[in-house]
């Protein structure tokens, strides 16, 4: 029985081999007997080593099928009738692909095979009969070679005239196949060779094609969870120390700034927002993405802040039950104290000043909605600032601003509020608060009244004016202290104290000087001069300041710089402070006759002669300083004479200085007169 079976198999193989040889003979006639016998003998020998049979149409083959039988079956001629038979039987395109001997490794060579076009038509006809319309051509090729290889092959084939029509068809089929199977965007991204596009990716046509692909998939499958481009882009651009989202945001910003990429950049940005919204990303988390790598203050002044606000609005519209505000988000992330510092810093810069004021008002509204009194806010903030720092500017000003808002909403609570503050703070801190509160309309009246009541108690104590000066917070009033009522009351108290304590005199100027330092005293004088009511007091402060310089024996050349006259340039002689300095120089000479100096010496200590020549020349054009300039020119010429300067030496020094000619002429004449005098 076994021998009979082998004989039967050999007979079948012989028949198939003959048919195959006839079909494949390019000359179109049957092979001779010798050729047939050779094929039969070879095939029979190999088949005797196998133990199984094969289905010639390729529907189901066991792993032990004889390789030679497979080759012979594949090499059989595929006639239109055979294709029709397979089509009627709805034989899968993948099996027909193998039956037609098309499953060779080189896919590009495959496109040149005549049978390939026949197979493509077969696959299309089969798809037309099927309820699933996706291309079995692309499905088969992809299963063998992968998406990217198939795509690259199609793109290469488009360059050949004889293949371009077929390639264009396959290109469309591949896209339809991807859409039908909801191919992962990252796979298509790689297939389109976008992994190597770099930061110039947005203007590329392949990128636009990829965006359209994702849109088409979502339109084709509305009941499925929508695909997003964002995970692919984030993964692609996640490199180094920068998060993928941050790089993507930079690409979007750069793209929106160019004409060629603006549309694509807006589309990607919209997709990013949709991705966040669909993922229920909170405004807090999205803020981290927008703020990545920068300070909060810089973030507030950047375009990304506006984009974040736009996301906040979109989030609130999508999830009204989880509605968030900018100030709540910032407070959750940074806390009241850190946020307060950030807003203070932002308020000092032009580009963020308006936004800082808006957020500050929202912070106040939030505290009001929480029904927090100024004392409640103080108790919360003090843990971050400490007792000392809290009472310094500008934190104190912001907190007192909230007091003003609180009283505006609760006018009947103003007295109680100040009473609570008085019980909480010592006199020194309370006076600091009261001094700030007087600047606000809702607080001014009560603060002034309480301030005077407390001050009267202090003045009645007979304590040192120096100590009371600090308790009254007069060391923190600022440049306009000379117009401060409490300061004048303190001056009156000091005069009374000095009369009552002749052996323990205290100086009002020392308190100003120590508290405000030199630059502060100068600003006090300048501010006081501008107000008719305080002008005399400003002059009194200035005189006291100069007397202090004399007491410490400050040289006129140093006083020159202390008055900032070295910054006046060619207009020095017209500067009012110049006369002040000249008067100081005279007073200094009177007090210290052994260290007398002159105006020209003081000028030369602070300027080169070249600069002085230019200054004198400019001053002579002003009638108010003409005589002074001429006198100083003469004084300078005498200095040259004392130093035995020669005209030739001076000419070399002043070469190119227009104002030097007149001075040199005068000097030469002086030397001539001196030489003729016995």
Curated annotation (Swiss-Prot):
Please give the chief subcellular localization of this protein: secreted
- The source's domain of life comes to Eukaryota
Where found in the cell? Answer: Secreted; Host cytoplasm
User: Which controlled-vocabulary keywords does the entry list?
Assistant: Host cytoplasm, Secreted, Signal, Virulence
UniProt feature coiled coil, ranges? none
Signal peptide region: 1-20
Q: Which InterPro entries match?
A: PexRD54_WY
- Residues spanned by motif RxLR-dEER: 46-61
| One Gene Ontology cellular component | extracellular region
- Recount the UniProt induction comment for this entry: Expression is induced during host plant infection.
Q: What does this protein do?
A: Effector that enhances P.infestans colonization of Nicotiana benthamiana leaves.
Know anything about its domains from the record?
The RxLR-dEER motif acts to carry the protein into the host cell cytoplasm through binding to cell surface phosphatidylinositol-3-phosphate.
Name the family the entry cites.
Belongs to the RxLR effector family.
Q: What is this protein called?
A: RxLR effector protein PITG_16705
Q: Which organism is it from?
A: Phytophthora infestans (strain T30-4)
The organism's taxonomy opens as: Eukaryota, Sar, Stramenopiles, Oomycota, Peronosporales
